[in-house]
Amino acid sequence: RDRSVSRGLGDVYKRQIEGKPDDLVINTHVCRGNYHSTYAFEGGYDPIAPYLFANEDVDAFYLEFDTPRAGGFEPLRYVAPGKKVVLGLVTTKAAELEDEDAIVERIHEAAKYVPLENLYLSPQCGFASCEIGNKLTEDEQWAKIALVKRIAERVWK
């Protein structure tokens, strides 16, 4: 049943972008909720990966991997060749900065499934995905962005 629902939604999505201009970039973000520094859902990408990552007609997937509740990188093995994967490894839900070396290590772990040249780094979601936003100050948000920049410069020299 879950597979038929996924396929049905995928078919609706495909019809929505049929005939899009060649230069229109389509990306998708798989969100688990981001309301005032809390989340709504947990669990890995395993149940949806075989269909979503292999079949969704997008240029890139923006995926949350900021906590263990997101599961491992193994489902990335289903990502179709040439697709980009943006790894949301830096949380927008807490002010504490992630360890740079640990993030670099996780990027290389993800590269076992998707070539490094097709991987990107970002915060796991927006800093204010809804009107109330998250419990981070503006300075804390800029520190997270600076962290992403530093790590990206290390990994993709």
Residue ranges of predicted features:
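Ligand-binding pockets and gating/stacking loops
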Residues: A40-G44
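Aromatic-lined carbohydrate-recognition surfaces of secreted/lumenal glycan-active proteins
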Residues: D22-Y35
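Single conserved hydrophobic/aromatic residue that forms the stacking wall/gate
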Residues: D2-Y13
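TRNA-recognition modules of translation machinery and tRNA-sensing kinases, especially anticodon-binding
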Residues: G19
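Catalytic-face loop-and-helix region of soluble metabolic enzyme cores
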Residues: G33, P47-K157
